[in-house]
Amino acid sequence: MIGLVGRKVGMTRIFTEEGVSIPVTVVEVEANRVSQVKTVETDGYNAIQVTCGSKKANRVSKPEAGHFAKAGVEAGRGLWEFRLENGEEFAVGAELTVEVFNEIKKVDVTGTSKGKGFQGAVKRWNFRTQDMTHGNSLSHRAPGSIGQCQTPGRVFKGKKMAGHMGAERVTTQNLEIVRVDAERNLLLIKGAVPGSTGGNVIVKPAVKA
């Protein structure tokens, strides 16, 4: 089944009838408009392309304007694609709302994690720090050895070292849908989801449910 594109609003909590506090992330899912339908005959695979939200007219490029005009949909803030399974059919211009999750209990949420800039090995990879005293005066947060000597004479690819952290695509799996608010186009998902407030997130039915 396809997913939906939403916007992370923030976190709050709701209470059950027993008084148990549940931390939830609020995801606003505006109607996803189908801007293109891809088929095996035309594109080699079955998928739909969707857009959501809106974009200022002066921010829409001419190719984008032509693409949206051909589909007869309002220009959105981006384009996303979902593969279709056999038997699923959608028409260009159709709108997908948060109600598609009425029968879904678990979802996977994909977003862009918060950027942390250039970070050391302790923060980036949870390395242990070295002694604060006992003769150590320079290497408290240093990573230590990064390899051998002249054989192999290089640092292996993938070695955990300091570097850019965050701002990458992250998926959190098997999150529980606590509530679907169709009136306000909101999804209340238990726990935290990747990304900063206001960021785009993709919500799909869980693959491991």
UniProtKB/Swiss-Prot annotation:
Report the gene name: rplC
Mind listing the UniProt keywords for this protein, alphabetically? Answer: Methylation, Ribonucleoprotein, Ribosomal protein, RNA-binding, rRNA-binding
Q: Which cysteines are joined by disulfide bonds?
A: none
Sites where N5-methylglutamine occurs are at Q150
HAMAP family in the record: Ribosomal_uL3_B
Question: What PANTHER family does the record tag this protein with?
Answer: 50S RIBOSOMAL PROTEIN L3, LARGE RIBOSOMAL SUBUNIT PROTEIN UL3C
- Explain the purpose of this protein: One of the primary rRNA binding proteins, it binds directly near the 3'-end of the 23S rRNA, where it nucleates assembly of the 50S subunit.
Q: How does it assemble?
A: Part of the 50S ribosomal subunit. Forms a cluster with proteins L14 and L19.
Q: Which GO terms describe its molecular function?
A: rRNA binding; structural constituent of ribosome
Q: Which GO terms describe its cellular component?
A: cytosolic large ribosomal subunit
| Family annotation (PROSITE patterns) | RIBOSOMAL_L3
The domain of life is: Bacteria
Where, by residue number, does the polypeptide cross the bilayer?
Answer: none
Instruction: Spell out the InterPro entries in the cross-references.
Output: Ribosomal_uL3, Ribosomal_uL3_bac/org-type, Ribosomal_uL3_CS, Transl_B-barrel_sf
Family statement: Belongs to the universal ribosomal protein uL3 family.
The identity of this protein, by name, is: Large ribosomal subunit protein uL3
What modifications follow translation?
Methylated by PrmB.
**One GO biological process term:** translation
